[in-house]
Amino acid sequence: MATVNQLVRKPRSPKVIKTNVPALNACPQKRGVCTRVYTTTPKKPNSALRKVARVRLTNGFEVTSYIGGEGHNLQEHSVILIRGGRVKDLPGVRYHTVRGALDCAGVSERRQGRSKYGAKRPKS
């Protein structure tokens, strides 16, 4: 326990909490424009062509965002919404694209887990 004199000389410093999603600026989602849409390969034990987009956000940040689901309609200059959430086997990808919002279409023919992919309820 520090004495009063010690605390006067050097006050207690607040704990600094480092965020995993700095580009969001404490917002749940951010809007951005795709500057490049491409595929990349995952880390060692896995093998695939993962779809990602380089996005210029409204606050000036440029981040890489993962495009989940089967098939997408994104291209350069598409306006998309991104949320936090990293992709474990893609280094440097800390954001996800929100499907079914703005220019990003939902996943067609999606039956289960539809809310995560912006898919409407099928007609019976």
Swiss-Prot record:
Which CDD domains is this protein grouped with?
Answer: Ribosomal_S12 (cd03368)
| Subunit structure as annotated in this protein's UniProt entry | Part of the 30S ribosomal subunit. Contacts proteins S8 and S17. May interact with IF1 in the 30S initiation complex.
Family annotation (Pfam families): Ribosom_S12_S23
Q: Does the keyword RNA-binding apply?
A: yes
User: What InterPro entries does the entry give?
Assistant: NA-bd_OB-fold, Ribosomal_uS12, Ribosomal_uS12_bac
Single GO biological process annotation from the record: translation
* UniProt keywords, alphabetically: Methylation, Ribonucleoprotein, Ribosomal protein, RNA-binding, rRNA-binding, tRNA-binding
According to its UniProt entry, what is the function of this protein? Answer: With S4 and S5 plays an important role in translational accuracy. Interacts with and stabilizes bases of the 16S rRNA that are involved in tRNA selection in the A site and with the mRNA backbone. Located at the interface of the 30S and 50S subunits, it traverses the body of the 30S subunit contacting proteins on the other side and probably holding the rRNA structure together. The combined cluster of proteins S8, S12 and S17 appears to hold together the shoulder and platform of the 30S subunit.
Is the keyword Lyase in the record? no
Residues bearing PTM 3-methylthioaspartic acid: D89
Q: Which Gene3D superfamilies does the UniProt entry name for this protein?
A: Nucleic acid-binding proteins (2.40.50.140)
Q: Name one GO molecular function term.
A: structural constituent of ribosome
Name of the molecule in the record: Small ribosomal subunit protein uS12
**Species name for this entry?**
Shewanella loihica (strain ATCC BAA-1088 / PV-4)
Reading the lineage from the top rank, the first entry is: Bacteria
GO CC: one term?
small ribosomal subunit
